[in-house]
């Protein structure tokens, strides 16, 4: 069934041929890095080691955590796993353990208990006056090791963004600490909070190190690094710069309408990677080196977000079916904890995809909507394939990293008025 209400551009499937940097054997790579780390060899047998895992959809995270657990067991230590999260899992101990379980991390599969609690202890104060909280189970362990992906953050730019330091500061602070830190971030910036709080955590002498994970543009596990506390800041800064150089973008300089099949916490902490869709709490098109996007239509909420629709406020329009899936408690806790309310706001919504497109296209700034440029992607994380409007093709044909793999086709809708899917449903990132 073709699009009947107005004439719009036909779409063509393209593929972005990003370099593939996948590790051949992730578990073996983790083991090798841990065995080569001097700091890991100095931990005495019998030590209780808290292994921290977070809530992001990190590829192979279950394999990585299992390899870390197995390493510590081979050293005759006693590893246990803790969820290192702020408000995620609806800010409850059970919810956070459930998040890990859905990523394949539980006692049965890991061979180590998962100990989840929101209890914290105060471990000091930063020079700026920030009281620093630390997960009680982590503090009472003999040592702590965090498994974290290093990548750009969705809300700010700096030398340290998302990674081991952010997990150490925000995640180990649990809900109580996360609320406090995000409030401070409004005053001194999130990077300042991460560095200050991270420094206090390091001064507890509880941190053993961290396993830094880098993913390529295909979301393959590309590199793993065992970071000791003495060189952690410098090494993480180096790794962040490297992974930023691998970043994928929407394949256009300017887009009138960006369509996403799904948003969700499994794709980004902000639901949508704001440095892909070019949005921030300060408004649209803040980020440099990212395509300018006028309007965003989000079709659905990922099941792996468990009702948390944080970031839906970055969209201009969505469907009733997405709104019906929202767990407002989880969404609003997430927004309030991060001291940002607009990402949790619900945009205008309509019964089906066709109606949403009919309503939003005339707002894209073109007197003739048939001239609106359109890009359709599965989510803000999976950018290898996209559907792009014909008027974008001239700028793409000479790009050696882009391959045109389909013929022009009109948008098609089913009997309920929803787009006939162009992409396979996103798999869980394990």
Where are these regions (language model features)?
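N-terminal amphipathic/basic leader segments beginning at the initiator methionine
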Residues: 1-29
């Amino acid at each position: 069934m073709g699009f009947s209400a107005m004439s719009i551009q036909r779409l063509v499937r393209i593929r972005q041929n990003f370099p593939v940097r996948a590790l051949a054997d992730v578990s073996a790579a983790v083991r090798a890095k841990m065995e080569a780390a001097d700091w890991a060899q100095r931990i005495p047998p019998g030590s209780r080691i808290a292994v921290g895992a977070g809530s992001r959809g990190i590829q192979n995270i279950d394999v990585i955590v299992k390899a870390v657990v197995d390493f510590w067991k081979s050293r005759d230590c006693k590893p246990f796993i803790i969820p290192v999260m702020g408000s995620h899992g609806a800010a409850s101990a059970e919810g956070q353990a459930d998040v890990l379980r859905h990523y394949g991390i539980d006692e049965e599969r890991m061979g180590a208990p998962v100990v989840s609690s929101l209890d914290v202890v105060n471990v000091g104060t930063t020079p700026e006056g920030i009281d620093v909280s630390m997960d009680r189970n982590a503090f009472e362990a003999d040592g702590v090791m965090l498994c974290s992906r290093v990548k750009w953050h969705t809300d700010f730019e700096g030398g340290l963004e998302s990674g081991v330091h952010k997990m150490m500061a925000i995640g180990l602070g649990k809900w109580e600490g996360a609320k406090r830190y995000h409030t401070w971030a409004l005053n001194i910036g999130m990077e300042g909070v991460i560095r200050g709080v991270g420094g206090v955590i390091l001064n507890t002498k509880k941190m053993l190190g961290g396993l830094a994970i880098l993913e390529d543009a295909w979301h393959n596990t590309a590199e793993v690094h065992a970071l000791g506390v003495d060189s952690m800041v410098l090494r993480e800064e180096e790794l962040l710069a490297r992974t930023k150089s691998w970043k994928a973008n929407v394949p256009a300089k300017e887009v009138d309408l960006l369509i996403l099949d799904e948003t969700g916490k499994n794709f980004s902490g902000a639901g949508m990677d704001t440095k892909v869709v070019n949005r921030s709490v300060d408004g649209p098109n803040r980020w440099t080196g990212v395509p300018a996007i006028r309007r965003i239509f989000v079709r659905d909420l990922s099941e792996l977000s468990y009702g948390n629709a944080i970031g839906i406020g970055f969209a201009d329009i969505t469907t009733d079916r997405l709104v019906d899936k929202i767990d407002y408690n989880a969404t609003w806790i997430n927004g309030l904890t991060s001291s940002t309310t607009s990402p949790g706001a619900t945009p205008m919504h309509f019964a089906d995809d066709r109606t949403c497109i009919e309503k939003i296209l005339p707002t894209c700034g073109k007197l003739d909507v048939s001239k609106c440029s359109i890009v359709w992607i599965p989510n803000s994380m999976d950018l290898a394939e996209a559907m792009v409007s014909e008027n974008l093709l001239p700028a793409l044909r000479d790009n050696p990293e882009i391959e045109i793999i389909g013929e022009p086709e009109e948008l098609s809708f089913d009997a309920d008025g929803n787009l006939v899917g162009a992409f396979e449903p996103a798999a869980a990132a394990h």
